């Protein structure tokens, strides 16, 4: 069974390290820095076997070159249409790969960037900068309609599927979420737990798909009243709004929150 551990990088990034109990191989997801990965591998007597990339941003890819130079035979998996040129195994929507004897499906999730993909199965979802706990990535390249379509793919995963995103943004995301749904009891309870974890400098991840469907306003954009507290300059609230229009309004407000 795959075990997932967080390697901290930069100020708020997590590089996810995948291992199993019966061998010394490791895979990492979105290594924005090489040094924390190399240190972790050395401390735990692990050998790097491969790299998974969700999208091209530097804080997800800058460590790749050094890691490959130290481990020249490893594969670097990533999206086929990516501006990042360090990918050796290109992936498209609907493909599957095997990592440590575990199958992952590739889901194209454009929105944050156009090349973004997620690596998912029924137990684990590596969502990069698409889905955060309590939030979502900024729309740097794609549209709100694209991002909502991407979210709909993730919403179909099992409720107990664990969500491993790449940033410790949970506390800030929940401050926004509670401004949107101040009477959501699940959200208020989750926010309290997250505050307690962060007060001890502990990680708030992984979340689960089921948890996000209860507390993440972006995952709940299909609810007709989700935008009722938005300032009108960000979203015209009508009963006929498409979910992606609600999503767009939420994202615009979050950008100014």
From Swiss-Prot:
NCBIfam families named among the record's database cross-references: GSH_gloB (TIGR03413)
EC class, as a word, reads hydrolase
Tell me a GO biological process for this protein: methylglyoxal catabolic process to D-lactate via S-lactoyl-glutathione
What is the top-level taxon of the source organism? Bacteria
Residues reported in the UniProt entry to bind Zn(2+) 1: 55, 57, 112, 129
Q: Alphabetically list the UniProt keywords.
A: Hydrolase, Metal-binding, Zinc
Q: In which pathway does it act?
A: Secondary metabolite metabolism; methylglyoxal degradation; (R)-lactate from methylglyoxal: step 2/2
Question: Which SMART domains does the record cross-reference, listed alphabetically?
Answer: Lactamase_B
Describe the family membership recorded for this protein in Swiss-Prot or TrEMBL. Belongs to the metallo-beta-lactamase superfamily. Glyoxalase II family.
- Which cofactor is essential here? Zn(2+)
Pfam families attached to this UniProt entry: HAGH_C, Lactamase_B
Molecular function in Gene Ontology: hydroxyacylglutathione hydrolase activity; metal ion binding
UniProt-recorded name of the protein: Hydroxyacylglutathione hydrolase
Q: Which reaction does it catalyse?
A: an S-(2-hydroxyacyl)glutathione + H2O = a 2-hydroxy carboxylate + glutathione + H(+)
**UniProt organism field:** Pseudoalteromonas translucida (strain TAC 125)
Residues annotated to bind Zn(2+) 2: 59-60, 129, 167
Paste the cofactor note. Answer: Binds 2 Zn(2+) ions per subunit.
InterPro entries, per this entry?
Clx_II_MBL (IPR035680), Glyoxalase_II_hydrolase (IPR050110), HAGH_C (IPR032282), Hydroxyacylglutathione_Hdrlase (IPR017782), Metallo-B-lactamas (IPR001279), RibonucZ/Hydroxyglut_hydro (IPR036866)
Q: How does the annotation summarize its subunit structure?
A: Monomer.
What's the source species' lineage?
A: Bacteria, Pseudomonadati, Pseudomonadota, Gammaproteobacteria, Alteromonadales
What is the role of this chain? Answer: Thiolesterase that catalyzes the hydrolysis of S-D-lactoyl-glutathione to form glutathione and D-lactic acid.
Q: What does the record give as EC number?
A: 3.1.2.6
